[in-house]
Each structure stands twice: as structure tokens, then as C-alpha cells.
Amino acid sequence: MTIESEDDVWLPVRECPDHYEVNRLGQIRNSGGYHRSFTGRIRKPRFDKKGYVIYVISINSKFRLRYAHRLVADAFLGPIPEDMQVNHKDGDKGNPSLDNLEIVTNG
């Protein structure tokens, strides 16, 4: 019998739930959809100029950049209101893990 850790929990990415999943560490994987042969494959993270972890994902057949911290917060904490932002508690923009994120007011 295998016991899953909390890091092994994968939730759908709200923008494209049939194609991508995200875990608590900020990893994204393919969950089917466009290319079933890639199902389960963890996507390669990239970093933007400010140090945020980003992913290139396909939404409605168009490639889009998405921030890992926002995908994690949206999946595990719920939708992010327009007047709120996702804060990295430790100040490390390269750490998109759920334990490091909180939704706060702008400003």
C-alpha cells in the first residue's frame, strides 16, 4: 500500500482543467487533453526577469505564460479576487509552494 504525501495531491488548473494539474509545490503536469501521450509529464519551469516561476501552457490552442504561485493559490486557496494579490511569505519569488503563499490586499 502506498501512502500519498500532501505534495502528491494534484488539483486541476482552473483555466484548463482537462489539460493541466498543479501540486502544492508549484509543479504543473499534463493531465490529458491535447496530447494524451504527455499525460502525467511534469512541465519544465522557467523564470521571468523578476525571479517568478512561470509556465508556458496552452489555453484554447494558444500558448500563455502563467505564474506558478497564482496557479497554486487559485487551485488550493480558491479564486483570487481582483483587488487581491498572492504574496510570498518568505520574499522568495522563486518559491511557489503553498506553505509560502497567502492572498493579501493590493498595496
Language-model segment annotations:
Residues 1-86, 90-107:
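Conserved recognition-core residues within compact binding domains
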